[in-house]
Structure formats: C-alpha cells, structure tokens
Amino acid sequence: MTILNKYPKQTKERNKVFFEKQELTNFDGPKWGGWWDTDGSFSDYKRENKRKKPYMHKKAKLALKDRQPVELFSKTFETSLIYNEWKTTTPEPYKYEYIAKAYVAGLCAEKAVWFTKKVYPYLIKQEKKDFAAKLLGYRPESKDFADWTPQEVRNYLATALEGDGLFRVRGEKTICIDGQLFSSDVQYLSDIKYLAEKKLGVTSTLSEKCTYKTEEGIKTKYKLCIYGSSKNPNNIGFFQSLVKDGVMTLDRKKQKVQEFVGQAWRK
C-alpha cells in the first residue's frame, strides 16, 4: 500500500470546518451517484478500537484501476488517496493468478454518513440503496424520477458509463459511436433507459449480452446501448454534452467521445 496524497485524520474540529466548507459548494449528487452505483461501495461492520471496545465502522469507498476519478474524490472530500497492489485469481474456468492494481479513497465515520445521506437520493441501483440504508441505519427518500433535471441525468449517465461502460468509435465515411453500459441488474438498466429517454430524449436499446458463472450460480449480463452516427441526428446532442467541462471525469473514455464529436461535426 502506498499513500499518494495524505490528509490528516478526522477530528470533530476538522470535520466541523469540512462540513461548513461543503455547505458553500454544489454537491454533485448525480455524478457521485453514477460512480457509486457502478464502482463505489458502502460498508458497515464491527471493529474494535485501541481499548478493545467494539464499534460500527462505516465507510463509503471508491476503488478503481484509473487514478483520475479517485483522485478527484480524494481532493473534493479531503481524504487520502492510496494505491494498492495484490495477488488475485480469475474466476473459473480460466483460472490464473495475476497482480490486481487499484487507486482507493474512502470516507469513514461521520464523513461517510454525511456523504451517504447526500448521495442516496441519486442512487438508482437497489442493491446500492440497500447497502447505503444499512450504513445509515434508516432508508432516506430517493429522488423521484419525475424530479430529475436533464443536467442531473446527463451527469449520472456520464459517470455510470465511465464506471461500468465503454465507448466504441468506428467507421470512416459514416462515423458511429456506441455508449454501452453493462449490468446483471436488468431493472437498473431499464430505469436508466427510461430516465435518459424522458429527460434527454436519448434513444437506446436494452439486450442480453451473455451468461456467466458465479459462486451464487448462473447470472445474465445485460447491455444498454446508446448509438450515435454522423448521418443521424438522434443522440448527437447527448454525446456533445458529455465532453463539456466537468461532466466526464476519466480522460481515456472522454477522448473516445471527443473523437466522435469532432469527426461527426466535420461530416
């Protein structure tokens, strides 16, 4: 474990200053909701302090192989950025050992509770809502889909696609792009499809991608695909909006969208 950017430990005084500063900023719930529904986690489990007294350890953590989003989270919420490497094994039947790498940043205790309360209204995946409710000890209200703004839906989609999705650009005379989001939770993808259509006018397709084996049994992976083409105006405005400043947080995926937007504009 290597600490790349270290912040002081939490104290009541430091947290008071932190929360006061955060009240003066615009918390982008949809952006972090997209990340937490894909790659973020909430945990709540028993630990012991130095006096062997048990307590519930609460944590909201983001861990990725890409540094950029985790570093942004670290700086935004003043928590240390850590780099980890460890040995792990791929699932059956292609079982082999390799070195996994991840950048990690997490909020603990009072800051974890604060963050979870703020992001909960913008969580869409039921599994993540359940973990968040366990951390908080109660279930807050989710934001009604009817009340989401187009900007909120765009910001959520941007980070969800960065987390569990991909962008693929192809073609020469006609330039095309696929924005694909994957999940084994078909209801989650259905909800996103509905939001994108209602709030952004984005058309998409939802289909079965593959089945795979887990310890819990056979699961199905689904794919939500948003298609864009230089010969078809549908969805081009959506892809153009993704490359605006502050929307996407991962340059290697943003560059794919920029490639499409730049070439489609010239066509």
Give names to the regions the model predicted.
Residues M1-K267:
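Internal intein/HINT superfamily modules and their associated LAGLIDADG
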